[in-house]
Amino acid sequence: MSSVDEDLTPEQIAVLQKAFNSFDHQKTGSIPTEMVADILRLMGQPFDKKILEELIEEVDEDKSGRLEFGEFVQLAAKFIVEEDAEAMQKELREAFRLYDKQGNGFIPTTCLKEILKELDDQLTEQELDIMIEEIDSDGSGTVDFDEFMEMMTGE
């Protein structure tokens, strides 16, 4: 399995397995590549037809016109993970905007401290101060969106 499947949760893999099995009518352990679009559609997963065709070509290494489950997961993961990352960035941007009351692209570290406290009420004052210190590396007393994203996603 490639590193991309490691980004999927066990729940997502279970959903993919169910979808795969329901399209593997002969129980051969593989599905025709033309069924992949139907499966993604049924899962409510948006995709670009051209990108999907390119990915199928890339993932169907033996060029059999059929995908084994591992190949299918590898392909589906590319759509699911990307969608999640985009959705997460959008949600974080919205959250940041709520706290950026002046709309100047910064939030005060005092405000960030409150956010962190809400996210994890087990954190001590000292732990919060250490986190703030790491995030606000320039000591400006404010955090911009990039610093906020980095803190929230660890990237």
UniProtKB/Swiss-Prot annotation:
Q: Name one GO cellular component term.
A: centrosome
GO MF terms here are: calcium ion binding
Q: Which family does it belong to?
A: Belongs to the troponin C family.
Q: Give all residue intervals belonging to the EF-hand domain.
A: 11-46, 47-82, 87-122, 123-155
Report what the protein is called. Answer: Troponin C, isoform 3
- What's the name of its gene? TpnC73F
**Binding sites annotated in the UniProt record for Ca(2+) 2:** 136, 138, 140, 142, 147
Binding residues for Ca(2+) 1, per the UniProt record? 60, 62, 64, 66, 71
- Coiled-coil spans are none
Tissue specificity, in the record's words, reads: Present in both larval and adult muscles.
Going by the UniProt record, its keywords in alphabetical order are: Calcium, Metal-binding, Muscle protein, Repeat
What InterPro entries does this protein map onto? Answer: CALM/Myosin/TropC-like, EF-hand-dom_pair, EF_Hand_1_Ca_BS, EF_hand_dom
For this protein, the record's CDD domains field holds:
EFh
Q: Which Pfam families match?
A: EF-hand_7 (PF13499)
